[in-house]
Structures are given as structure tokens and as C-alpha cells.
Amino acid sequence: MEDNTITGEVKKKGWSFKIIMFWVIAFLITAGSAYYQRLTGPTYPSSGVVSFQGKDVKYKLDRSCDTSRNAVVKLENIDPTIKGFIEYKRYKTNDDKTLVEMKNDGGTLSAEFPTDKDRVYRVPAQKYEYRVILVKDNQKSEIPSEPVVLRFKGDVPLVILLIHVIVIFSAMLVSTRAGLEFFNSNANYKKFALWALAIMTLGGMVLGPIVQKYAFGELWTGIPFGIDLTDNKTLIAWIAWIVAAVASFRSKNPGRWVLGAALVTLIIFSIPHSVLSGNTPVK
């Protein structure tokens, strides 16, 4: 009798450990996916090192900026005798390029854009392409060789943005955990499928459009109104979880549907954020 009790306790502890491991693995996969998405996304600053006048010049150029201010460009540890310029124009237009001279203050080059004449275009979703040009002794270096694309966005209330980020991360976490339930002999697909669908609905289909309205003036720019990949990939994940949730009640083998929805979610959320995002129409 005593042996059976001990065996039962070990089994309970074993299952608890297994469940904890499922959540740990789900968290690591989700965190890794989120980090990769942020690191490779089009809003992550463009950075690198170039050689000019025999010295390495490090740069970090923003690719996103709030409409409440100009985009600031700064290069540090520069030879005080080097001149710098920002060359910019509106993205995908026939505008003439504008050249803004940078101020060299003790080895720090800095300037901002757009200039007063272009400030009317500093609106949500407006994109600019720009780069820095260094000049000294008839030598010139363009940093980087291909212009950086910067997009302006409206200010999103911090509370709304934080809630959105937390809920979306939770949706990815629960989605991944639901997929791992496929490897649990006592799987509860209904519970995880419904939770994943509910959180995905709140984060992606409710809070997502609200954040986008603040940032870019539009609630939805995916299908059928546009090709914005952020909206479209959210829509695909949402539909996948609707299918998985229905299958968890009706299918004889719901595990494959839940695992499939989890894999779809993981793959599409690994795609860089804001790819194929809109650009304010030229007027």
C-alpha cells in the first residue's frame, strides 16, 4: 500500500515537471521568435561600420520616428574637420533630393530632417529615404550605400501600447504551448485552442487595429483593403485558431489541427514586423 502511494506521488511530480517544461520551452521559443522579429524588422535601426579617411566610422540610423518631432541623425567620434550632410527625399516619389548640412560639434556630427519646407509631409505612414554623406579633401563616403527608409508614425498612448505588446506576446506564448500539447499523453486541446483564440482575438483583432489607428491613422490595412503584412499575418493566425478551436470539438484527431495552428502562428510571427507596410499617398 505504501509503495503504491509513493509511486502515485512520483507520477504526480513527474507530470508537474513535464507541464513546467512545456511552459519553459514555449516561453523560450516565443521569446526567441519575438527577438528575431524585432532584430530583423524594418523598424530596427540600420547600423554598421564604414572606413573613411583611414578611420572606422560607426553609424546607427533610425528607421522609425514619431510625427511629433523631426528625425535626428547623429554620428559620434568623427574627425572635427570632416563635413557631413543628410541627403533625403520622400520614399518612392520623383521629389528632388534635399541636402542638409550637419553640424560638427567637437567630433559629433548631427542634424535633423525634414526641413521646414517638407514638414507638411511629416505625417503618419509617410516614408523617407535618406543617408549620410561625409566629405573631406575631395573624398566622399555615402553611409550607407543604399538609402535607409524611415517611416513616421503617430504617438500611441503608452498604456495601450504596453497592453497590446503584453497580450500579443501572451497570444504567441499560449499558441506555442498549445502546439506542445500535441506531445502530452493527457492533452486538453479544447482548453488551449480556446485560450489561444481568445487572446489572439483581443491582441491582434481588437488592440492591434487600435494601435494602428493611433500610429498610422488607419484601423485596418490588410485584406481586403490593402497588403499590409502585419495585418494579414495576424488575420491568418486568427483564422488558423478559429479552425483549430472548431476542430478541437468536432475532429476525431484535434491534435494535428492545434499543432498546425501553432506552427502557422510561429512561422508568420517570425516574419519581420511591418514588412510591406503602407506609405502615405503622395498629394
Residue ranges and their predicted role:
Residues P157-I163, E218-D231:
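Non-cytosolic membrane-interface motifs at loop->transmembrane helix junctions
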Residues I29, G203-L207, I268-P272:
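Alpha-helical transmembrane segments of multipass membrane proteins
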Residues E2, I166-R177, K233-S248:
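Hydrophobic cores of alpha-helical transmembrane segments in multi-pass inner/ER membrane proteins
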Residues N188-T201, N253-A261:
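Membrane-interfacial loop-to-transmembrane alpha-helix junctions, especially the N-terminal start
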Residues T234-K283:
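Generic detector of multi-pass transmembrane helix bundles and their immediately adjacent loops
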Residues P209-W220, S274-G278:
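Juxtamembrane "helix-exit" motif on the non-cytosolic side of transmembrane helices
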Residues D3-F169, S175-T176, F182-S185, P254, ...:
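Glycan-association/targeting regions that enable binding to alpha-glucans and other polysaccharides
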Residues W195-Y214:
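Small-polar-interrupted transmembrane alpha-helices in polytopic inner-membrane proteins
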